[in-house]
């Protein structure tokens, strides 16, 4: 019983809800064998012929290319495109492509050279010895994409189904009423299709392989059964003709009885589907080493005199293909790419054939009625009954017209396979599929904008995070630079701090700085007291100077300031010498009458010569020598004139003016000391001579002594305390002399 149930389930097929039965027009092209066509004058190869981004161009204008040579680089989900023939790259520019919008895309224009030479082809005939990754990479670089209409990269699809795939379905249903490309391919190339299926089986390792084909293709069914032979790993399933039984979800339901959930792919239930044309392309890429450069295209319609299926190179202009089918171009031709239900009208006949192009329909005026005027929806629900995906076409229509994108998305708009069954049964002639396509495009554009905005936000956040990290790193470096100093730097800093502390302590000892409070009045008492002390000191010094001046009598000899302590020492030595001489003279002249001496002294004024200080030490030495000579002469005269009367001595002393020799102080302390020593020696000699000549008459001695002029040095007021002390000493000596003179006069 279980075996019977398994056998029944093994050969059983299921049905799907909805669907339509349009009139079939396959016989126009299915009876004509595949044929090759001449090369066009130029090929137009769009860079994007698959679902995904376009590749990076790797050729330049003027380059020579060979058939099968890559024109773009394929990375990730980006498939490369290849040169369909040998020739020259004439241009790289925008060109109208096979799309309902009629927009232009970047394309490569190649002018064929007529030789149709192949580039180096890399084959993997022993693919069973190759790894899975090697096979997938080979398929990717060959540019293999789904030829059933979706254009999804085959390698990426297989990569996603490597795990959990239990059933591999080969789609040969081809449910469109006019298209016979897969039919003719299965009739003529069944063996190669089976080889491609074997490669897929090697990659996926499924538990079973099902080949689905509609019952309206008897020749193809026979060819496949012949190619399969007695194979048990592949099963051929013939299904009833119903549109759209060729859809992926619908064929999965028919062959397995499983339904693909909303928003999911068939791989979610362990099923993977490939088209028979894709299997054939896989065989050529792996066994023959040929990339995808051509495919089978159906030329059909009553406007063609020679309908059929041809091998069309990718990039061939539609105009060239229609010309090969005997199409007469009218003023306003109507050409549909694809079938009458899922196809679209071409905006121009210069658009090229791409990987997903499987049919060119050129109907006559009677074959296809003109587009009727669109009417309002009457909510008859026929579209809902015909929808094979179980959607609500009328609700999607209202959402699309009202730009209610989220509601349309929530009602599973993207599960619509755009089969056109709803529009086919609509009594109001509403082109529902066009509304759905437009709504899908708008939602995709919104999603792309949102994705770009999200990416921009991510980049902005990353930039802000990077700036924050850089800022934190800078602050950390600054902190490390501020704290991480070397030992020498620490020593230098410590020494500087010690100096500052010493200065602060010194300042505190001399006078503590005044602390300034923010809200208090400044306390200047210390500064005021210091200023008062300085003023008192100045007043005391001035009073002391005035008292000294009052006690000191007026000196006839003007004094000049001594600029140097050495000069003051010389002046002091000279003063002492003069004092000794005056004392000796006073003692010698004690017996002379006072009246005559006084009268003679006052009779003639003493000529005082203002002396100048020598400019250098040599002048000082000369002055000292002159003084020594005069001292010797004075001593000699004193000895000779000892018997002279005192009166004559006094008169002679006063009669001659006293010659004052200007002396200069030596600039060196040593010279000043020498001069002082010489002066002391002279004083001792004079004292000895005075003692020897004590018996000589006083008058003659006095007259001889005073006869020579006495050198009087004019002193200057010293600039410092030492000079002041010298001046005071000189004044005291003069005072003593005056006192002695007064006492002698009284006697």
Curated annotation (Swiss-Prot):
Region listing for Disordered, in residue ranges: 538-564
E.C. number: 7.-.-.-
A Pfam family it matches: RnfC_N
Membrane topology term: Peripheral membrane protein
Residues that, per the record, bind [4Fe-4S] cluster 2: 387, 416, 419, 422
PANTHER family named in the record: ION-TRANSLOCATING OXIDOREDUCTASE COMPLEX SUBUNIT C (PTHR43034:SF2)
Family: Belongs to the 4Fe4S bacterial-type ferredoxin family. RnfC subfamily.
Signal peptide residue numbers: none
Protein name in UniProt: Ion-translocating oxidoreductase complex subunit C
Keyword Iron: yes
SUPFAM superfamilies on file: alpha-helical ferredoxin, Nqo1 FMN-binding domain-like
GO CC field: plasma membrane
Domain 4Fe-4S ferredoxin-type stretches: 368-397, 407-436
Cofactors named for this entry: [4Fe-4S] cluster
């Amino acid at each position: 019983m279980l075996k019977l149930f398994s056998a029944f389930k093994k050969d059983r097929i299921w049905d799907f809800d909805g669907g339509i039965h349009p009139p079939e027009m396959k016989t126009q092209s299915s009876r004509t064998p595949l044929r090759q066509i001449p090369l066009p004058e130029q090929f137009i190869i769009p860079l994007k012929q698959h679902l995904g981004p376009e590749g990076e161009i790797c050729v330049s204008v003027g380059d020579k290319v060979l058939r099968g040579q890559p024109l773009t680089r394929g990375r990730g989900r980006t498939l490369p495109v290849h040169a369909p023939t040998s020739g020259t790259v004439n241009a790289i520019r925008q060109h109208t492509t096979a799309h309902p919008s009629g927009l232009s895309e970047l394309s490569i224009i190649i002018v064929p050279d007529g030789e149709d030479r192949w580039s180096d082809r890399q084959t993997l005939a022993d693919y069973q010895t190759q790894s899975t990754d090697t096979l997938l990479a080979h398929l990717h670089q060959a540019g293999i994409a789904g030829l059933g209409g979706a254009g999804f990269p085959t390698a990426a699809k297989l990569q996603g189904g490597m795990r959990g795939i239990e059933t591999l379905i080969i789609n040969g249903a081809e449910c469109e009423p006019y298209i016979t490309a897969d039919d003719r391919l299965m009739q003529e190339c069944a063996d190669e299709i089976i080889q491609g299926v074997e490669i897929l089986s090697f990659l996926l390792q499924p538990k079973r392989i099902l080949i689905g084909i509609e019952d309206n293709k008897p020749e193809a069914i026979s060819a496949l059964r012949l190619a399969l032979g007695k194979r048990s790993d592949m099963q051929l399933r013939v299904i009833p003709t119903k549109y759209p039984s060729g859809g992926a979800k619908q064929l999965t339901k028919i062959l397995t009885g499983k339904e693909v959930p909303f928003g999911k792919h068939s791989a979610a239930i362990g099923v993977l589907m490939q088209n028979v044309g894709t299997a054939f392309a896989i065989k050529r890429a792996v066994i023959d080493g040929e990339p995808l450069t051509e495919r089978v295209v159906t030329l059909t319609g009553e406007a063609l005199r020679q309908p059929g299926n041809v091998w069309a190179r990718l990039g061939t202009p539609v105009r060239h293909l229609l010309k090969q089918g005997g199409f007469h171009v009218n003023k306003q031709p109507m050409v549909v790419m694809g079938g009458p239900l899922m196809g679209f009208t071409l905006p121009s006949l210069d658009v090229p054939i791409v990987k997903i192009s499987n049919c060119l329909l050129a109907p006559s005026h009677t074959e296809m009625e003109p587009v009727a005027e669109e009417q309002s929806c009457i909510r008859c629900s026929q579209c809902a009954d015909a929808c094979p995906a179980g959607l609500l076409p009328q609700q999607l229509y209202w959402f699309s017209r009202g730009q209610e994108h989220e509601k349309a998305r929530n009602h599973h708009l993207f599960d619509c396979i755009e089969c056109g069954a709803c529009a086919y049964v609509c009594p109001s002639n509403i082109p529902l599929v066009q509304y759905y396509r437009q709504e899908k495009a708008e939602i995709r554009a919104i999603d792309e904008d949102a994705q770009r905005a999200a990416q921009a936000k991510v980049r902005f956040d990353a930039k802000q995070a990077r700036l924050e990290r850089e800022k934190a790193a800078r602050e950390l470096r600054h902190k490390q630079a501020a704290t991480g100093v070397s030992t020498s730097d620490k020593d230098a800093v410590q020494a500087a701090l010690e100096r500052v502390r010493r200065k602060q302590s010194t300042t505190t000892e001399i006078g503590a700085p005044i602390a300034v409070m923010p809200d208090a009045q400044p306390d200047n008492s210390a500064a005021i007291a210091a200023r008062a002390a300085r003023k008192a000191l100045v007043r005391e010094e001035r009073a002391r100077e005035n008292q000294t001046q009052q006690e000191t009598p007026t000196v006839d000899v003007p004094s000049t300031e001594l600029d140097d302590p050495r000069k003051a020492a010389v002046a002091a030595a000279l003063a002492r010498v003069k004092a000794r001489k005056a004392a000796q003279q006073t003692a010698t002249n004690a017996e002379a009458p006072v009246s005559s001496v006084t009268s003679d002294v006052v009779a003639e004024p003493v000529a005082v010569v203002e002396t100048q200080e020598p400019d250098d030490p040599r002048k000082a030495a000369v002055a000292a020598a002159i003084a020594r000579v005069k001292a010797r002469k004075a001593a000699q005269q004193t000895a000779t004139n000892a018997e002279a009367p005192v009166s004559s001595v006094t008169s002679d002393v006063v009669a001659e003016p006293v010659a004052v020799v200007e002396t200069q102080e030596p600039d060196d302390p040593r010279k000043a000391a020498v001069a002082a020593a010489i002066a002391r020696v002279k004083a001792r000699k004079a004292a000895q001579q005075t003692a020897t000549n004590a018996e000589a008459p006083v008058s003659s001695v006095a007259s001889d002594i005073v006869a020579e002029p006495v050198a009087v040095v004019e002193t200057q007021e010293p600039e410092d305390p030492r000079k002041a002390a010298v001046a005071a000493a000189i004044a005291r000596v003069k005072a003593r002399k005056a006192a002695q003179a007064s006492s002698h006069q009284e006697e």
